């Protein structure tokens, strides 16, 4: 009996769903409510679910920061909660190529797995302050993420995910031009 916050760009993974999904917009779900959540597919070539007992789970990372920006832009300019699915698949394909990552299902999660040790090294350098509730993250001189939460406890949950999202894009130095 608590409200549930689902942040935009949360990666929802699992074999029970037909494809891995990314939440398109932040949703605060009231207690005991049933809500349709806008998502896009982050895995292009898997169209079937599995009878496996693996539960649906939330990834340790969010969708990469440049993708978060593009998704937000789609939603803002279309004045809806939906994003352009083909553009999301295209940017995932580009990201797989950029990191020379093979994925039968074209899953963005494979990139995070491939660079996990590099990304976790970056995550370890960020420790939240006692009462900190937000963070501004940049690549070079460009601000790419600004997130504020209602409590330090909530912030501590999301900080590593936000850093992973930004870290993935930081490996390509020309990705964000000043």
Predicted features, each with a name:
Residues 7, 40, 138:
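Residues in well-ordered beta-strands of folded domains
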Residues 3, 33-34, 143:
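Short, solvent-exposed loop/turn motifs
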Residues 131-178:
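Helix-biased "structured C-terminal domain" signature
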Residues 42-127, 135-137, 144-147:
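Terminal connector regions
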Residues 10-13, 42-43, 149-155:
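A short, sequence-level motif marking secondary-structure junctions
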Residues 2-22:
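Short acidic, flexible loop segments centered on an aromatic residue
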Residues 15-55:
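Intrinsically disordered, low-complexity Pro/Gly/Ser/Thr-rich segments with frequent PxxP/GP/PP motifs
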């Amino acid at each position: 009996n608590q409200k549930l916050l689902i942040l935009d760009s949360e990666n929802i993974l699992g074999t029970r769903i037909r494809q891995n999904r990314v939440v398109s917009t932040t949703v605060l779900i009231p207690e005991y409510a049933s809500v349709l959540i806008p998502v896009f597919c982050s895995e292009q070539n898997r169209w079937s679910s599995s009878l496996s007992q693996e539960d649906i789970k939330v990834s340790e990372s969010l969708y990469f920061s440049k993708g978060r920006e593009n998704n937000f832009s789609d939603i803002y300019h279309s004045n809806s909660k939906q994003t352009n699915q083909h553009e999301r698949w295209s940017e995932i394909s580009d990201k797989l190529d950029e990191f020379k990552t093979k994925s039968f299902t074209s899953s963005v999660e494979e990139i995070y797995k491939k660079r996990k040790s590099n990304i976790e090294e970056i995550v370890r350098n960020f420790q939240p302050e006692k009462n900190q509730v937000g963070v501004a993250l940049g690549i070079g001189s460009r601000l790419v993420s600004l997130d504020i939460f209602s409590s330090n406890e909530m912030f501590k949950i999301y900080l590593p995910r936000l850093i992973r999202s930004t870290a993935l894009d930081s490996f390509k130095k020309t990705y964000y031009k000043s």
